[in-house]
From Swiss-Prot:
Keyword terms: Antioxidant, Disulfide bond, Oxidoreductase, Peroxidase, Redox-active center
Record's function text: Antioxidant protein with alkyl hydroperoxidase activity. Required for the reduction of the AhpC active site cysteine residues and for the regeneration of the AhpC enzyme activity.
Gene name linked to the record: ahpD
Assigned protein family: Belongs to the AhpD family.
Catalytic center residues: C132, C135
Disulfide bonds: C132-C135
Signal peptide: none
Single GO biological process annotation from the record: cell redox homeostasis
Name under which the protein is recorded: Alkyl hydroperoxide reductase AhpD
Catalysed reactions, as listed in the record: N(6)-[(R)-dihydrolipoyl]-L-lysyl-[lipoyl-carrier protein] + a hydroperoxide = N(6)-[(R)-lipoyl]-L-lysyl-[lipoyl-carrier protein] + an alcohol + H2O
Top-level taxon of origin: Bacteria
Enzyme Commission number(s): 1.11.1.28
């Protein structure tokens, strides 16, 4: 995790908790390395911070097969589309929209390069970051039915939460050095 260590060091003091959590959530736990790093890659991509994504990709590529990284990136891309679409349908709450076919291609969801259950876990984590209740519920059911435990789901969402917070914190790093209005006036 040498590259992520550099990210942790770049986080500003207000993100001290995120520094500590970033180190902790990527340690071995209930998830396999492929699951842990796939979730990290997918959620770093969903967080849209190039620096974080580059660091996570570098560390992940040293730990897992290329197919896992490819699936994680594909999950982030597919869920960027699906989370908007299904969140809209859920928020509007009209049966007429729910009856309309999505007509959105999602072939990778059906035929991932590596593990189907892992791909669904990556999609679940991205959906949590993107706030799509419908997708979170759907993917959670699939991964549990596929043999993952609630502890594994919980661990994946913890990783997603911390990676998202790290992306936000990296953005804050640029503002931490900016003097406040009160300090500038004084």
């Amino acid at each position: 995790m040498a590259t992520l260590d550099a990210i942790r060091e770049a986080l500003p003091e207000p993100a001290r908790d995120i520094k500590l959590n970033l180190q902790a959530v990527l340690q071995p736990g209930t998830l396999t390395p492929a699951q842990r790093w796939g979730v990290a890659v997918a959620t770093a991509a969903a967080a849209r911070n190039e620096r974080l994504l580059a660091a996570v990709l570098a560390d992940a590529r040293a730990e897992v097969e290329p197919a896992v990284v490819e699936d994680a990136l594909a999950a982030a891309a597919v869920m960027a589309m699906n989370n908007v679409y299904y969140r809209f349908r859920h928020m509007v709450g009209k049966a007429s929209y729910a009856e309309k076919p999505a007509r959105l291609r999602m072939n990778r969801l059906v035929k991932p390069a590596a593990s189907k259950v892992d791909f669904e876990l990556f999609a679940l984590a991205v959906s949590a970051v993107n706030g799509c209740e419908t997708c979170v519920r759907s993917h959670e059911q699939v991964v549990v039915a596929g043999g993952l435990s609630e502890d594994q789901v919980h661990e994946a969402v913890r990783i997603a939460a911390v990676l998202h917070a790290a992306a936000v914190s990296l953005e804050l790093a640029g503002y931490a050095a900016v003097p406040s209005a009160a300090a500038a006036a004084g």
